[in-house]
Amino acid sequence: MKKDIHPDYHPVVFKDASTGHQFITRSTATSDRTVEWEDGNEYPLIVVDVTSESHPFWTGAQRVMDTAGRVEKFQRRYGNMTRRKKK
């Protein structure tokens, strides 16, 4: 392999913003924030919105999505339109 062409691949801690669950893995991602891990070492901390701990597919929980606002917006835009008659 050629030297000095690969990105820095190092341990990083990812934290789920909604559940607070943290896990360590290896990544090329970097961050100015750090956290002390269970082994006593400090690692870069990356906060993410969704992980397997909070995603509905993995948890089995369903979230209620606010579709009423979308439907009302659609009705305002296109509700008064009629189909064109065929000639």
Swiss-Prot record:
- Does Ribonucleoprotein count among this protein's keywords? yes
Question: For this UniProt entry, which residues form the secretion signal?
Answer: none
Keyword tags: Ribonucleoprotein, Ribosomal protein
Instruction: List GO molecular-function terms, semicolon-separated.
Output: structural constituent of ribosome
PROSITE patterns according to UniProt:
RIBOSOMAL_L31 (PS01143)
Determine the domain of life of the protein's source: Bacteria
> What's one Pfam family the UniProt record gives for this protein?
Ribosomal_L31
- Which family is it part of? Belongs to the bacterial ribosomal protein bL31 family. Type B subfamily.
Subunit record text: Part of the 50S ribosomal subunit.
UniProt-recorded name of the protein:
Large ribosomal subunit protein bL31B
Q: Which gene encodes it?
A: rpmE2
